[in-house]
Structure formats: structure tokens, C-alpha cells
Amino acid sequence: MTKILITEFINQNSLENLNKKFDVMYNEKLCENEKQLITIVKDYDGLIVRNKTQVNSNILKNAIKLKFIGRLGVGLDNIDTEYCKNKNIHVQPATGMNADSVAEYVVSSSMSLIKKIPMFHNGTIKGEWPRTTIKSIEINHKYLGIIGFGTIGKKVAEYSSKNGLKVLAYDPYVKEINNKEINAKLSSLKEIYEKSDIISIHLPLTDETKNMVNKSSFSQMKNKPIIINTSRGGIINESDLIEAYNKNNISGFALDVFEKEPIESKFY
């Protein structure tokens, strides 16, 4: 029977279904213990991880039976995909499975920040009455810039355009938009930075995209946009982000991911 090792959290229903077909070893703490993982991975045909398990060459060279790696998520920056390719180890991300969930986060976060809900809430519970001092805006006919127009970026565009936002999308690998459900215009990064009231990032973390959104990027943003990152920490230079916010160059930000997790004190 095929043996599968799971090193991070998986929901109970999925685990039960896997157990019906495979010999499964589940230990969600293994992601924190590379030495132990190196020792036991040699006995398994398959490996299932999230983003904490660093599937590097130290682990892979000991995975002598490994045929496939399942990634419970989309990004593959924690997996040495080049090594896997050379060793004929198939790597399968859960592409598209979380698209609706991420799109809902982007829409709800942008609405919350556009309408200044956190500011109103914080002021009210302090005994203040910020009704006349905090100004919110309507999103109708405002611009949403999407950086990275894959499955999730397209779902964000679909949701957002139905709420009245004008959608600009940047992706060097997308040449045209064929889906009639998606009302978006392919744009340059420069146009997105200059026009957008909200910017949402949906990129993999690579050498090319690391710190891609930085001080230079923020200096080009003319409308003091809201910044939302649900892709990978490290794509935004976090120090530059905080500086841009403190200087009122951006109106706010919502981060679902950070370069270091748990987060550092600079965000407190």
C-alpha cells in the first residue's frame, strides 16, 4: 500500500478519506523538526505539506522512495522544485482550491479599510465619537489594481467588478482576457501604481518578485491606495510599507502573510 507522510495540519474529513486508500502517517509537528523528518521520510512514497515544511535538498536526498509531493496551498517557494524535477518527483499544488476564500478576504478587507471601519471601531470603544473626523469614500468607479492575474487574481477581479470597481491587471504572462465574467483591463505596473485606489497582490515568491513592491513603488502611487497582500510575505518590503503608511503615502494595508511569522514587533 502507498505510504503517505503528512507534516502539517489537514482537516479531519480529508485525513479520513486518505486513510481509506493509503497508509497515512500524520504528524503536524514534523514541519518544526527537520532532523526527524530527514530520518523518517525515506520510508514514504508521498509527502503532503503546507507552507511551513521546508522541503529542501537535505530532506529530498533522503526521500529515496518519494514519488509525489502534495502542497495544501498554491505557492511552492518552500519546495525545491528543481531538485524534484531532476528526480522525477511530481509536485502538485492545490491550484484554485482557495480562490474564493482569498477573493472574499480581499473584498472584505478592502471594503473595511475604504469605509474606515477599524478606525471608527477603535475610536468608539475608546469613548470617542469619530463620526465627523474620519472620512470614508464609496468604491463605485474607483480603481482596483491587481498584480498577478492567475486563478486568484481573476477571481478577485470577478468579485470586485461586480461591486463597481474598475479593475486594472498586471501580469507579464497574460496576453489577453477571454473570460466574459471578468471585466478587467490589462495594464502596466506604472499605470496600476498611478491610478489605483486599492492594490491587491497575487504573486509567487521568487528571486524576481522578492521586495518587488518597495519604496520606489510607493513613490509612484498617486491616490494613496490601500495595499492588500494575500500571496507571500517578502514580496512587499515591509519596512518600506510601514514608512509609506506613516508618511501618509498609502491609506492603509491588509496583510494575510508576512516575511516572518509570527509577526515582528514593528507591526504592533
Which residues fall in each region the model found?
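A short helix->loop->beta-strand "cap" motif at the edges of active sites that frequently abuts
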Residues: 63-68, 87-89, 165, 223-225, ...
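Short beta-strand "acidic-cap" motif of Rossmann-like dinucleotide-binding folds
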Residues: 167-169
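Short, acidic/turn-prone active-site loops that include or flank metal/cofactor-
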Residues: 28-34, 72-76, 96-99, 173, ...
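Nucleotide donor/acceptor-binding cores
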Residues: 2-3, 137, 142, 225
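Glycine-rich Rossmann-fold phosphate-binding loop(s) that bind the pyrophosphate
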Residues: 149-150
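Phosphate-binding beta-alpha-beta segment of Rossmann-like dinucleotide-binding domains, i.e.
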Residues: 87-89, 94-143, 155-162
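Rossmann-like adenosine-cofactor binding region
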Residues: 42, 55-59, 172-268
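An N-terminal-biased, well-structured beta-alpha scaffold segment characteristic
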Residues: 1-92, 214
